[in-house]
């Protein structure tokens, strides 16, 4: 008996010692990574949103698991091709007073997630925007209590491969989720809406207002064919790209019933949108400060996730109505008596919706478009030929083409009907910005359409000039 007690005591002490060693190791690794973040900021290399996470990942990939496990209320994860930064920011606004581990800078790869968890020492809840390609690794390590999958569009084919490849990886992710994990899916996306069909804890969301359907599905739409039998879908309503109300007349596969939806949508150009938000907990009218149908999608997804995390309908409405744009996404920047309106474009579906929103407000006479081909943009820029630029160019008097691929962008504009002498090619973004502002009258607004890395470069310029604070200080 005494021997058994000795063995039990030894085993208990071994567990305590192992946990102490693990905790001590994590503490040392965390100190090193936080020091890297401070050095990054002091050196002007950014906000320390990825470097600490890269270091922590190299030192110990399991540290992410340990940091996530410390969150008292667990974590929620948001992934999508388009809108994940805005949707996550909306959820943060709705949750308001909760202490969040939130990657508000948009650093959404594994390194950014690690940096976020490392920096949020007293956080209650993780709120993590995750790159669609990084989702499997993040889910394995964070084990969220709620997962929002908002859409899949063709984007960065050189990096991700075909859309179906990402969809299959997501399907495997969903199959591995614990039954208690809340799954929220955009029911209007055929690839995404089907992911939760066999799960009890699935909440489909979407739009329910055929008045805003396009006359026909866009030629650049990505999911035209039934995910079950491969036959073409019939779209009863097509809202944004391939998002809409669909059914297969061959096998009967169709959009799932929406549990959270936007109805009675009214678009007010660049001034925003209003809609009736329908949820299992009731219905409320929402006046959204952001424009465009795709921001209504973002808002409905955010509402669905916030409700799954315990937010009241009143909190959801209040949060959405006071929401300001995420950086680079319909962000207005005052510049000495003028302003810059920044609208991120990165793939055909997103760019077409930006153009649609600008059209509704009257296409601007002056545009600055910046096209880069860095890894984060996608090396293959052939997607610009799938964008319906023509309606925007029809109202333009001058376009300044900038970025790494300014020459190809200028060619696309001339093929779109703009006279050659109406296109100025200025690859250097700072000079292009100065030229655009010089052509903008006092009190006027310069509309800038940048790809992702061009948007970051633009922000560096306006930060250096003192027009805005760095995004990591705004967070």
Can you describe what each PLM-predicted range is?
Residues 5, 13-53, 223, 230, ...:
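ATP-dependent carboxylate-amine ligase
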Residues 17-206, 210-225:
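Phosphate-binding loop of NTP-binding sites
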Residues 88, 112, 136-138, 158-159, ...:
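Short glycine-/acidic-enriched loop or helix-start segments at secondary-structure transitions
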Residues 91, 95, 113-117, 299-309, ...:
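Buried hydrophobic packing segments
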Residues 100-105, 128, 184-186, 204-205, ...:
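General beta-strand structural signal in soluble alpha/beta enzymes
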Residues 149, 153-338:
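Acidic, Mg2+-coordinating active-site environments of NTP-dependent enzymes
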């Amino acid at each position: 008996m005494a021997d058994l007690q000795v063995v039990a005591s030894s085993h208990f002490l071994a567990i305590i010692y192992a946990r102490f060693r693990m905790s001590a190791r994590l503490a040392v690794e965390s100190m090193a990574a936080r020091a890297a973040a401070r050095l990054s900021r002091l050196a002007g290399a950014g906000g320390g949103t990825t470097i600490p996470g890269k270091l922590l990942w190299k030192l110990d990939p399991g540290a992410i698991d340990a940091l996530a496990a410390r969150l008292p209320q667990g974590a929620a994860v948001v992934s999508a091709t388009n809108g994940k930064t805005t949707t996550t920011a909306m959820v943060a606004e709705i949750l308001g007073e909760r202490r969040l581990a939130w990657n508000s800078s948009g650093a959404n790869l594994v390194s950014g997630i690690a940096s976020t968890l490392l920096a949020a020492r007293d956080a209650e809840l993780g709120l993590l925007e995750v790159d669609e390609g990084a989702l499997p690794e993040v889910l394995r390590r964070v084990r969220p209590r709620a997962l929002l999958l908002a859409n899949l569009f063709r984007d960065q084919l050189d990096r991700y491969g075909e859309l179906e490849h990402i969809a299959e990886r997501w399907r495997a992710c969903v199959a591995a989720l614990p039954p208690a994990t809340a799954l929220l899916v955009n029911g209007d996306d055929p690839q995404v809406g089907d992911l939760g069909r066999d799960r009890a804890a699935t909440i489909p969301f979407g739009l329910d207002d055929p008045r805003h359907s396009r006359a026909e599905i866009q030629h650049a739409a990505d999911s035209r064919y039934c995910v079950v039998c491969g036959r073409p879908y019939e779209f009863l309503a097509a809202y944004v790209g391939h998002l809409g109300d669909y059914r297969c007349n061959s096998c009967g596969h169709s959009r799932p019933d929406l549990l959270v939806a936007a109805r009675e949508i009214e678009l007010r150009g660049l001034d925003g949108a209003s809609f009736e938000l329908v949820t299992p907990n009731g219905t409320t009218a929402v006046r959204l400060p952001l424009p465009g149908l795709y921001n209504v999608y973002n808002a409905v997804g955010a509402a669905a996730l916030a409700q799954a995390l315990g937010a009241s309908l009143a909190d959801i409405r209040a949060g959405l109505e006071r929401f300001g744009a995420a950086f680079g996404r319909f962000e207005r920047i005052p510049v000495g008596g003028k302003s810059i309106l920044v609208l991120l474009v990165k793939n055909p579906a997103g760019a077409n919706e930006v153009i649609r929103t600008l059209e509704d407000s009257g296409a601007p006479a002056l545009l600055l478009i910046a096209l880069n081909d860095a890894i984060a943009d996608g090396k293959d820029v052939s997607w610009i030929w799938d964008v319906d630029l023509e309606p925007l160019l029809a109202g333009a008097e001058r376009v300044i083409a900038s970025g790494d691929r300014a020459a190809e962008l200028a060619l696309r504009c001339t093929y779109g009907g703009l006279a050659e002498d109406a296109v100025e090619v200025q690859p250097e973004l700072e000079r292009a910005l100065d030229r655009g502002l010089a052509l903008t009258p006092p009190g006027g607004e310069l509309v800038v359409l940048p790809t992702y890395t061009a948007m970051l470069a633009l922000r560096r310029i306006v930060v250096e000039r003192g027009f805005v604070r760095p995004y990591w200080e705004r967070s």
